[in-house]
Amino acid sequence: FLPIPYSDDTVKMIILTSENKKHDFYTLDTIKKHNELKESIIKHQVAFITHGFTSSATAEHFLAVAEALLDKGNYLVIMIDWRVAACTNEIAGVKLAYYNYAVSNTRLVGNYIATVTKMLVQKYNVPMANIRLIGHSLGAHISGFAGKKVQELGLGKYSEIIGLDPAGPSFKSQECSQRICETDANYVQIIHTSNHLGTERTLGTVDFYMNNGKNQPGCGLPIIGETCSHTRAVKYFTECIRHECCLIGVPQSKNPQPVSKCTRNECVCVGLNAKTYPKTGSFYVPVESKAPYCNNKGKKI
């Protein structure tokens, strides 16, 4: 059995606002005929959410991210569903054998997002400063490729790309042009949670290493709990959007300072407001094993 060849028709979009939460799927052609889109975009920030290998836009943890954004009331969320090209529909026993096939589709899906972005900018006058991309695993690299493509198209840079535990296999040794990179947007935020499915390599403007970027609390033994750790990046980010917790990043060092001594000029809160902090670089983030994952006794900076 061979995976279905990639085409733009194999990628679907779900368009959500706080007023419209129906999980209707759109293609590139049908979105152009979506008459309500213009009015929706004018009023909102735009966030693309992109899943990874063998997943889908309707996976529970991605819908939770969308819901958290919509609860803020000022977002239009475009969920990219590339499940066919991500081998989600393949027979369970052979999915892993098709990983490289999914990898080869990442740039194509990134170009697809860039095409949608071009339509938003040129047809609906959406400023690039109003658009942020959020991607998990392979979806993080897809977001990076979209960031490269919109620059090639002369559209400028996205406001921000947030990479949720970018996939390590096939990417960790690649140069900037072949993976998500700090130049792909005005601000690139990376949340590291696993060192096998993800990567410990610094990739962004800021790199947050949750529990040192591996073996997340509550996920069990190393290797066995790797999938749990890999997905935990999405859950941490969702909690940060909800503001139930400020996950504070401390500058990485051999002996990182206690969170209790953090100031706004030295440390950074993970999430949508990270780019409002002056510090960039790599940060260690202590976390707990259960939601909301805080390990700072409610401290905010």
From Swiss-Prot:
SUPFAM superfamilies per record: alpha/beta-Hydrolases
| Protein known as | Phospholipase A1 VesT1.02
Q: Where in the cell is it found?
A: Secreted
**According to its UniProt record, how is this protein modified after translation?**
Is not glycosylated.
So which tissues is this one expressed in?
Expressed by the venom gland.
Q: Which GO terms describe its molecular function?
A: phospholipase A1 activity
According to its UniProt record, which protein family does this protein belong to?
Belongs to the AB hydrolase superfamily. Lipase family.
Q: Which Pfam families match?
A: Lipase
Return the EC number.
3.1.1.32
Q: How does activity depend on temperature?
A: Loses its activity after heat treatment.
Task of the protein: Catalyzes the hydrolysis of phosphatidylcholine with phospholipase A1 activity. Shows hemolytic activity.
Give GO terms for biological process.
killing of cells of another organism; lipid catabolic process
Q: What class of enzyme is it?
A: hydrolase
